[in-house]
Amino acid sequence: MDVNSRLSVQSNVESPLMHEGPEPQQITSSAAGNLAGSITACKKVLRSNSLLESTDYWLQNQRTPCQIGFVEDESENCASVCFVNLDVNKDACITENLQQKLVNVSPDLPNLISSMNVQQPKENEIVLLSGLASGNPQADFDVSQCPWLPDICLVQCARGNRPNSTNCIIFEINKFLIGLEVVQERQLHLETNVLKLEDDTNCSLSSIEEDFLTASEHLEEEIEVDDCRSGLENTNVSANVLESKKPKETTQEGWDYHKEKLHCALGEKHIRKHRTPSTKTEGSKENTEENTSLKSLNRLVRPSHLKSEVAGNKQLATNYSYPENIKGELETSQMLFIPRDAYLSMVKKDVLSPCSVLSEQGGSHRDHDVTPNPLPPVQNGEASTGEYATNLAESVMQDAFIRLSQSQPTLPQESAVSFSMRSALLPSGCCTKDMVVPRSWNELPKIVIVQSPDGSDTVPEPNVSSWPDMEFVETSGIFSADSSSRPTQSALEVALACAATVIGTISSPQATERFAMEQESLVSTYAQRGTGVQQTQVPQAFMAPSTTEYSFPSALCGMTQVASAVAVCGLCEKEEATCPVAPTDLLPTSGASEEISSIGSLVMERSTELGKEAIAEALLREATLILARPDAYSSLGELLESVNQRIIETTSKTQTLCTESVQRNELAHTLSNVILKHSVDELHQKTTMAHPTDERHPCGTLDTLMESVNQLLHNVICFTFKKMNHIVTLSEHPSFDQAAGQAWVKAFACPSSQPLSNAHGTGLVIRNLVEDASPKSNKGGARPELVNNPRLQSEFSCSHRMFDSTAKSFPKEIYLKGIMGEDTRNPHHTLNYDSNERRASTDLGKLTTASEGCSGFQETEDSIVPNTQEKYICATPLNNEAQVNLSLLGDDLSVPAQSTLEAKQSEVYGITDFAEELAETVVSMATEIAAICLDNSNGKQPWFCAWKRGNEFLTAPNGSCRSLKRKKENSSAGSTVRKHKPPRLSEIKRKADEHPELKEKLMNRVMDESMNLEDIPDSVSTFANEVAAKIMNLTEFSMVDGVWQGQSCSRTRLLGGDRWNRLKASSCESIPEEDSEARVFVNSLGLMSTLSQPVSRASSVSKQSSCESITDEFSRFMVKQMENEGRGFELLLDYYAGKNASSIMSSAMQQACQKNDHLNVRPSCPSKQSSTESITEEFYRYMLRDIAKESKDGASSRRSSHDWTTGLLSPSTRSPLCYRQSSMPDSRSPCSRLTVNAPVKANSLDGFAQNCPQDSVNVQPVSRASSSGLCKSDSCLYRRSGTDQITNMLIHETWASSIEALMRKNKIIADDSEAANASPGPVSSGSPLQVEKNANRLATSKGHRGPTLLVQESVDYQRKDAVTEGNHSPVSSPGKTAPVKKPSDFDPRRETSACHNAAGLNSPRRSLCSRDVPLIQIETDQKEECIGEPGPFLSQSGSLEETEGHQPEETIPDVARNEDTAPSTCQSSRDSLETSGEVEVEVLKEDIPRDESRNPPSSSEESTGSWSQLANEEDIPDDTSSFLQLSERSMSNGNSSGTSSLGIMDLDIYQESIPSSPMINELVEEKEILKEQSESIKEHASGLPGRAASPQRSLLVINFDLEPECPDAELRATLQWIAASELGIPTIYFKKSQESRIEKFLDVVKLVQQKSWKVGDIFHAVVQYCKLHAEQKERTPSLFDWLLELG
């Protein structure tokens, strides 16, 4: 077989996406060249002269069939390939139904197929497509849920109904071979690229700060590289896609221009990347062609997602889907307004400059171009981690630049430009465009300006192509405008300087100096130059704050916040979709949206002139006119002229309001986006249904859209006033009414400076406004009636604006408070609004949250600092911290989430999802911001000091951000990162004693001298508190890693900056606190107070530096340590002492938990955090004393204690897995209690190992809800971390040199000889490593079986397979291969063996029997081993069940199904096991088939604390410094079964076991298992682990048929099985939903295994069947039935 032709849509614009010709052009570019940067099509023609084509080859094939697995549709942990069968009846080929089916697979497909003429490939042809966007999530085809699908989609012509000749079968096999092989190779390529890129940039994506820092470090190289790579590639891709539809020259120009532009607008891309999701739902149904072009963008976006894919596939999926949707939306708008060519250009323009497209299309589109700009960023954003970092940096730059540049009033110029734009004057057009559509930070072009401050470059760019010029013009216009006027130039320079500062390079020192000096002048100038209405307004809003309190540090912090928020939103699947940052994107997506955005800008302008009711009315009229009648003006110039005239007339009169316009602008954009999105969605649905293949929507579409939009706007206004009334009513600020007027004025005067105060002030104002305007607004939002209160009227007239202005002071808070807050308080309210409204509000909330979360949040913080200083109403927010938190944080985030949740019940719209996303976004943002601030390298500085200080600490923000970089502890530039030495217990005690007040105020957090309680809380700290409070408010929706909140600087100090950085989020667990008022204290983030039951923390430190025994106090101390340090104490111990320390800690934690019922201890968290040995030693001493004391109590205890100590082996080799901690776990357990998941047993460590049946392990089921789902924070990209050799060495060295000796000396661990004696029998055969691994695995799997399992029960006799695999006792010391391990002679089938099976839990029960390892150790082992050795076990449960292939598969599925609920799993697994009829072993009361004795999947997880974050060893060695604890969700519940926890992780290993056996009933070759233990050990240890390590090697095969009846699904699945076996793929998975006869298939697989069939045998059987089928046709049974009969 060779490649006849290869069609590859490369980043190169030149390469046509698809040629119309009969055969695709041969392009040599490699399909995997770009990281999913383009659609690649490769047609392969099978030649009959290939070895693989010969029948003999297949008949004699002796390969062993690979394993078969079935996964739930949601599974997304392994590479996947979709075989799309294009066989259809000729007459049905063109039907819309088929087209829609293709669209469901991928919107790109129909266009690709038609353009490539592969509608009906020949039998020997196969077309490989990669880079496609995923299909419509709503479609009945589930593939869209698979993030991998978009990555690799194989379109092939199946045999279908054609004769089942041998040649046909071979062709099919070969096609499957090609598809699977390509997927494998591509996966490896992507894997390497992603890893390499991330390694290069040190981007673990663990935190925004890190990314940000990385970006600053690599900005210069990466901007160019990324611009070229991602910008060009992405652009090219989009261009290519468009290209097929539009003349190449134009595309090329546009793209070239865009490339430059993208280069400048990486940040924008980033933002857009996030925004794009907003349009997600709209475009999915768009025309396929348009979708295709958009998808190209999506593909571009995908790379970044690929990066994040490491973190979680779901994100990818989301990303894929949303870019498509966006594209669809864009296409739709374009379609609505533009002919195809125009549309193409528009898309390009969108990518390049929506404005140009708009100009091309008409005035209405002009605004749109801004939105399109975000799309290109999306494209660029996808490229690589490095690119991601760069994008982040650029995004920050852009924000700074936009803030500054937009502040410059260029409105007059803008209008002029608009005319010229219309006239096709590029330079003026550019200016005009920018001015016309100041898209707040959506306008990346400004970044371009950053590159060329003069703006001259920008102007020329627009010239490149007329339509792109428009957008560019806009950019240039801004630049040129800036350049034209000195103040403007200064603003630009300031922006550049700001951006440069963020990036770490200030090109113009003068600019920096001038920045502060000119800020005020610029602001005033801008205000005066109100002409810049939209732009000016936005900039002014920013400028005002900057002038008052704007400093580079604060700017940087704000930008960082924005960037982090954006990144967070973008990285989160849902967040991306929600990210309002892309509101413009939404707008650009549709012409209507464009119009709206322009209108929005106009509205913003109006808002600038809030004082003038006439202007507001005029603008609204203009907007309505524009939206409704794009042709009302012959050209944009006319429209702009009329609008500009009105605006200019009032500009001078509304200088004060100019600043507000920025925020209002953003709000307006957000609202317009929401509205447009909703309208466009409806329109799309209608048009798609009516004219699925029509590229252009019917003329009526615009009217319909207009009508819908107007209705929504009207509703918005009405609801806005209603909500305002509610807000006012609900807000508990009686004094606000009086201060309302003043506050309002202040808000306008210093909108940015008093965000917090305005939160309340705004509320007051709002109340007044509501009182004045609500009656009128109720009337349909009649603006005229608002005239009475001109400011309010204008503002209210534009509800977005109103929110903006309110939001401006406190944009997000008030806005959300109004929308969400009201809803939260009056859920029914939300429900009352029509679904459209609700949806709009939800979206709006989302957008607001996202965009404002970025800009608003930033603004809030920036302004907060000023605000407090300004002493506006800051006090009120502080006093009403809860209120503020709610409004600022809660309403913004949690409240919206809540309201959405409430709405969700009554609405179809995924309000729940939105709420979750919102909560996640908020939490992530808050966490990141807090982390940035917390990790402030200037040790003594309070939390957010960097923001507050101003220019003197120009580098501080960078420094603090840098310190966050997890990989580079000392990378903070210029800032000294103190290495904090964890205090000894004595120190902690001493300090605690010295500062008794700390115990109360700081919730008894142990403080070190660096903490200065005296520091007066500044606005920044206030903000931090509020953030914490807000996060706390979100706990219901997501258990926030609250620790960081609770963590004050002291904690940072205590843990040490680097460690804190790593721990900050994941370690955070909401811990119940006694003081509900804790939030009041500035230094305590107030996290704890919101939690439920109090944790007894009063006696925070033991009174004696050395404890005589593990007293209650000490236990409490340990618990507190864990709470305060995110389980850090245990982590520290674990780091040095390995599993033993961890085990001991578990015991200690159990004891502590016993005393604190509300605490559920889950200490098992591998971590690389550094610590001092002293703590470990001291702790061991306590342990030893306690043990000694216990030993005196009685013979039994003595004996047990002896057994226990004997069983204590040195820690088994730490699994080399790194757990990437996330700043925000994706799913947080809704329960507010700290879940420390340790086996809760207790009286003594020793007792834990005692052999009393009563010693049941109490694993309290804490909510497992959080156990699935990856973190969605940008900072929490979970990386499958690779082995960190250095870390391992360090651990083992430490162990060997100190801890081991210490323990041996104290008899904590037995000598080898003792251990050997202890072990009942020799270690089973197998390499020591394997044995050790197996033992570990066993230990892991032996975790507790159920929420309350008898210890002995927990012992799972590993299913035979597991046992045989590693008969060794689970515990294995690194040095000793498990001397004490379970005897090799242990026969899982022997009942007595139960005793011997020192598997651990069991042995504790019968300590007299071989007392292998103390339960504690096993517990630890389980955790680590489980993680480390998932391969062999596949997932504890999954592999167990799988390995237990002997057991009827049916049983296993049942067990697996229950896996999610550990307890039920145990039961069901037990039952099913019993049913299996395996030999039963009598374990206490229950008889469990030995086979089955292997733990149900959940058991190990329960004990291990659901290691959802298992990392793959091989994946990322570079994350050495970040062994992070599993985030809350993974830790959510010890109970969560392996599947749920595993499911969370990307662990492909677990993918197999994820749903546990039920999901993936993996058939392990029983014969192998039964034959040789050692052999099976090798196979499983090597094969499975290998698979685990590189899950990409396992593939998910998705089959999609245009006509489901057409192909023989069973035959096809069998052939795919053969192909996968030929390729050596360890396991191939099929989607359960697509395989109707799973049981039959499993039976066939079992049969094949029993008969030891090879691939040749299967092939032979298939050939025989095909012959039989050809002869008997109708009477032939199905293949599976026939095979089973044959067997």
UniProtKB/Swiss-Prot annotation:
Where is the sequence biased in composition, kind Basic and acidic residues?
1382-1393, 1482-1494
Task: Enumerate the InterPro entries for this protein.
Answer: AKAP_110_C (IPR018292), SPHK1-interactor_AKAP_110 (IPR008382)
Q: What is its main location?
A: cytoplasm
Instruction: Return the Polar residues bias intervals.
Output: 1-14, 1366-1375, 1461-1470
Q: Which residues carry this modification: Phosphoserine?
A: S1010, S1070, S1092, S1105, S1106, S1109, S1244, S1273
The segments labelled Disordered in the record are 1-25, 272-293, 964-989, 1363-1406, 1421-1520
Region of interest: PKA-RII subunit binding domain: 914-931
GO MF annotation, one: protein kinase A binding
> Where do Low complexity bias regions lie?
1495-1508
Query: GO CC: one term?
Result: mitochondrion
Q: Which UniProt keywords apply?
A: Cytoplasm, Phosphoprotein
Location comes to: Cytoplasm
A matching Pfam family = AKAP_110
Free-text function comment from the UniProt entry: Anchoring protein that binds preferentially to the type I regulatory subunit of c-AMP-dependent protein kinase (PKA type I) and targets it to distinct subcellular compartments. May act as a converging factor linking cAMP and sphingosine signaling pathways. Plays a regulatory role in the modulation of SPHK1.
What the record says about its domains? Answer: RII-binding site, predicted to form an amphipathic helix, could participate in protein-protein interactions with a complementary surface on the R-subunit dimer.
Stated family: Belongs to the AKAP110 family.
Q: How does it assemble?
A: Interacts (via the PKA-RII subunit binding domain) with the RI subunit of PKA. Interacts with SPHK1; the interaction greatly reduces SPHK1 activity.
Name of the protein described by the UniProt record: A-kinase anchor protein SPHKAP
Lineage, uppermost ranks? Eukaryota, Metazoa, Chordata, Craniata, Vertebrata
Gene name per UniProt: Sphkap
